[in-house]
Each structure stands twice: as C-alpha cells, then as structure tokens.
C-alpha cells in the first residue's frame, strides 16, 4: 500500500522525511486498515493481470526469442574482455544484465557468455569494489579495473548481487561465489 526508493532524514525539497513517512504509514495501518487492505489487494490484482497478459501471450514467440538473442549479442559486443563488465570508468555492477546472461547461458550454453560471466564475477569479487574485510559491494568502481571503490554501499545493489552470486554458484559450482553470498548477507545483517 506504500512504496518509495529514498526518503531524506528530514523533510526536504518537497519530500517527506523518513520519520514522517513512517508515522503516516503507521497511522494509515492503524486507523484505515480496511482501506489499506483494499488498496493492497487492488495493486496485487493489477500486477497479476499485467503478468498474465504479458507472459501468456504466445504469439510472436520467434520474435521474442530473436529479441533475446539480439540483446545477448549486443551485451557481448560491449563486454570488457580485460577486466569484466561493460564500459570503462566509472564501472557499475550490472546484476540484472549478468542475471540475464546467466539465464541465457543456462538454457543455451555458449563459451563466450560463460567466459564473460566468470571474468566479470571474478573481477568484481577480487577487486576493491568488494569489501574484502566486512563483506558487501560498494556502489561502483571509480576505475575500469574494479579496484577503487566509491565508498557507499546500497542495500538494493547488495541484494541483487547476492542473488546473482548465488545463481552463479549454482551454475558454475565455484565455492568462492557461495562465500561471497554469505559475506554479503552477513554484512547486510550486521550493518
């Protein structure tokens, strides 16, 4: 019944502060619970309708497969074969892109995609973007080598990267990937 991505500590620039948001959500839940439940159910129903329509459309199946192949090919063209990932500096982890490639590789194994994934995952976990002492990934690397981190860690990045490394561990059976997952989750729990 309520969503957002960032709330400043105090009211600022027309945005409510985090404390005000929490108090408003608490008030709505306590005093307008039926309305909250109704809105929540409406949102869930709408999402389910969209997903059913989106994923049950079997027409143009070849076109959808072609789009996936084209997306994979374009991503591989942009790949940094020396240091992993795409582009140069600053270099951001792209867990959703790597997850897409991982799934593509699961269903249609290709040596080039396999190599790109391993290069990227290994470079990130061995670089300075990964906090070797406390676990968790920094937001991005200020250089193209994944060595110099921008010293900020985001929960959503670490959640996506934990999922990515878990799926990569299941596919490639590299013990280091499972260790990264555990360290990320420990970091998130402790911080």
Identify the meaning behind each predicted range:
Residues 1-191:
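Replace the tail clause
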